[in-house]
Amino acid sequence: MEALVYTFLLVSTLGILFFSIFFREPPKVPTQK
């Protein structure tokens, strides 16, 4: 159980960092709709 909790915390931290950088610096790739 502890390994699962640590993995969840690690993934959540990486996700928050990724989203913060992604929304702060939007990609320069033009979106095709």
From Swiss-Prot:
Alphabetized Pfam families for the sequence: PsbT
Location(s) in or outside the cell: Plastid, Chloroplast thylakoid membrane
GO biological process, one term: photosynthesis
Parts of the chain that traverse the membrane: 3-23
Family annotation (HAMAP family): PSII_PsbT
Protein's job: Found at the monomer-monomer interface of the photosystem II (PS II) dimer, plays a role in assembly and dimerization of PSII. PSII is a light-driven water plastoquinone oxidoreductase, using light energy to abstract electrons from H(2)O, generating a proton gradient subsequently used for ATP formation.
Name this polypeptide is given: Photosystem II reaction center protein T
Species of origin: Pelargonium hortorum (Common geranium)
